[in-house]
Amino acid sequence: RVIGXPLFKGKSXL
């Protein structure tokens, strides 16, 4: 997704 997850900024991994 493009929300920013807890793993990457701008790319959630979940």
From Swiss-Prot:
Which superkingdom, per the lineage? Eukaryota
| Name of the protein described by the UniProt record | Unknown protein 21 from 2D-PAGE
